[in-house]
C-alpha cells in the first residue's frame, strides 16, 4: 500500500477527507495536535453536562455535505440525529414561529403583512436562482438589499444570519446568503431542516468518521503536532512531527493534506521561499475572525419546550438562546436542563474580563425578562469568550471560489481542505463540502 497519506488535523474537514480516501483503499494517517478529535467542534463534560465549544448545528439535515459523506461511506446509520425544528422569535409582543419555508413567510406574525410581501420580493428571486448566478454576488454585502427595509424586517434578517452564520448581516456575503436560501428551498431539492447528534456533543460526527477510518486500517493519532512540511524539488517528501513527549520525528510522505486554516499553515509549516510571498499575502487576507461570547446555563427544570429562540431587536444583547436539552436530553444528567446563549462581539472585548462580565450579566437579565422562572431555576453558568475562524466562509469577497485553493500550483502532493478553502456552506458543512471537492483531486494525484 506504500507510504500513508498524511492528514494534518482531525476536524470535520480532515476526517471527512481521510474517510473518503480510506473508502477507496488508501492507507491514511491522521495527526491531531490536541488531545481531542473534532477541531473547533470538540466538546467537554462539565458537571455531567456535555458542553459544545459554542453552538454547532448541522444545516440542511440529510441534504448537508456532512450527511452526503456519511451516506457515501454507508455509515449514515452510525450517527443518530435529532431534528432541530422548533424555532421561534421573541419580541416585545411575545413569541412568533420561525418560518420553515418560503411560503411560511406569508404567515410570519413577527412582521406586518406589507413587510412580509417586501420580504418575499427579496427572497423569492434568491431562492429560485442558480448556484452559478450567486457567484456574481460574492463580493456584495447582504446589507445592500436590506438597508432600506423597516426595522422589524431587518431584525428578521439578523436572526436568520445568527442561526445560519452565527454573525450579523453586515458581515455576510449576499452570494453566500443566497446559496443558503437555495439549499433551504424544497422546490429546488433543498431543506430548511437542521439536525444535531442525538447522543450529544457535535464532535460525535468526528468520532463516527474516526471509527470508520480505523475500521479501514487507517490511523488516527492525537497529541501529534506537525511542525514542518518538507518540500523538495517541488514535491512533498515528508513532515516533521513533535509528539506529546516533545521529541521530533521525520516521517516520509509523498501526499499531505492540511485541514486547518490555510492562512496559518502557509505561515507556520513551510521553509521560507517554498511558497510564493504574493500567494501567501493573498491568502493572509482571509484571516478574518468573528468573536463571540457565549454562556452555558444549567437549570433545575425546563423553562421552555422550544429548541431555539431568537430575541429580536437592537435592544437585546442576546442574539440566540439554544435549549440543548430540548434538542436531545442526552447532554444533561437526569432532572437538569442545559441551554446556551450567545452574541457576537468586537475581538478586543474577549480580552477584557470586565466587558465579558457586563455582557454576561445583560444576557442573564434578558433571559430572566423573557422567562421569569430562569433565575430561580439556575444551578450554574459557564461563560466563554472565544474567536472563531469560520467567519472566513461568509464575508463579502472571501467566500466560495475566493478562498484558498485546494492545491498550490507547482507543488505536487500538497492539498488543503476545510472551511477556509474553496467551498460553500455553513461552518462544518463548508468543511465537508471542501473535502467532497478536493478528494477527487487527491485521487487523481495518487493515480498519476
Predicted regions and their residues:
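Mid-domain catalytic core of redox enzymes
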Residues: 227-337, 405
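Short beta-strand to alpha-helix junction loop
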Residues: 57-62, 134-138, 188-212, 353-359
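Dinucleotide-binding Rossmann-like beta1-alpha1 core, especially the glycine-rich loop
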Residues: 49-131
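Helical element adjacent to the flavin cofactor pocket in flavoenzyme catalytic cores
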Residues: 183-247
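Glycine-rich FAD pyrophosphate-binding loop
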Residues: 22-47
Amino acid at each position: 500500500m506504500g507510504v500513508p497519506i498524511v492528514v494534518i488535523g482531525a476536524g470535520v474537514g480532515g476526517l471527512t477527507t481521510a474517510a473518503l480516501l480510506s473508502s477507496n483503499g488508501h492507507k491514511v494517517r491522521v495527526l491531531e495536535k490536541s488531545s481531542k478529535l473534532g477541531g473547533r467542534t470538540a466538546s467537554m463534560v462539565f458537571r455531567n453536562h456535555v458542553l459544545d465549544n459554542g453552538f454547532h448545528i448541522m444545516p440542511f439535515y440529510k441534504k448537508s455535505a456532512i450527511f452526503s459523506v456519511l451516506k457515501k461511506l454507508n455509515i449514515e446509520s452510525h450517527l443518530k440525529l435529532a431534528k432541530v425544528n422548533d424555532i421561534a422569535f421573541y419580541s416585545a409582543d411575545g413569541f412568533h414561529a420561525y418560518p420553515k419555508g418560503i411560503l411560511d413567510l406569508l404567515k410570519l406574525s413577527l412582521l406586518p403583512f406589507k413587510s412580509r410581501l417586501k420580504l418575499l420580493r427579496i427572497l423569492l428571486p434568491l431562492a429560485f436562482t442558480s448556484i452559478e448566478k450567486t457567484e456574481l454576488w460574492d463580493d456584495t454585502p447582504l446589507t445592500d438589499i436590506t438597508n432600506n427595509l423597516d426595522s422589524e424586517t431587518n431584525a428578521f434578517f439578523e436572526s436568520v444570519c445568527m442561526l445560519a452564520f452565527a454573525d450579523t448581516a453586515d458581515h455576510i456575503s449576499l452570494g453566500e446568503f443566497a446559496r443558503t436560501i437555495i439549499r433551504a428551498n424544497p422546490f429546488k431539492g433543498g431543506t430548511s431542516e437542521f439536525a444535531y447528534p442525538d447522543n450529544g456533543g457535535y464532535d460525535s460526527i468526528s468520532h463516527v468518521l474516526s471509527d470508520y477510518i480505523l475500521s479501514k486500517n487507517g490511523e488516527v493519532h492525537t497529541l501529534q503536532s506537525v511542525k514542518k512540511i518538507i518540500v523538495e524539488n517541488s514535491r512533498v517528501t515528508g513532515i516533521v512531527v513533535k509528539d506529546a513527549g516533545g521529541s521530533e520525528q521525520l516521517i516520509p510522505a509523498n501526499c499531505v493534506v492540511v485541514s486547518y486554516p490555510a492562512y496559518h499553515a502557509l505561515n507556520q509549516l513551510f521553509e521560507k521561499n517554498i511558497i510564493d510571498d504574493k500567494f501567501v499575502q493573498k491568502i493572509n487576507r482571509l484571516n478574518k475572525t468573528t468573536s463571540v461570547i457565549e454562556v452555558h446555563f444549567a437549570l433545575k427544570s425546563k423553562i421552555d419546550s422550544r429548541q431555539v429562540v431568537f430575541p429580536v431587536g437592537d435592544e437585546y444583547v442576546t442574539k440566540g438562546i439554544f435549549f440543548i436539552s430540548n434538542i436531545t436530553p442526552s447532554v444533561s444528567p437526569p432532572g437538569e436542563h442545559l441551554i446556551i446563549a450567545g452574541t457576537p462581539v468586537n475581538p478586543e472585548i474577549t480580552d477584557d474580563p470586565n466587558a465579558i462580565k457586563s455582557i454576561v450579566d445583560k444576557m442573564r437579565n434578558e433571559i430572566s425578562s423573557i422567562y421569569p422562572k430562569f433565575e430561580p431555576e439556575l444551578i450554574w453558568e459557564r461563560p466563554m469568550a472565544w474567536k472563531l475562524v469560520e467567519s472566513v466562509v461568509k464575508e463579502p469577497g472571501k467566500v466560495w471560489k475566493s478562498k484558498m485553493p485546494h492545491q498550490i500550483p507547482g507543488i505536487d502532493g500538497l492539498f488543503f481542505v476545510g472551511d477556509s478553502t474553496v467551498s460553500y456552506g455553513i461552518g462544518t458543512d463548508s468543511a465537508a463540502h471542501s473535502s467532497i471537492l478536493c478528494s477527487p483531486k487527491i485521487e487523481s494525484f495518487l493515480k498519476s
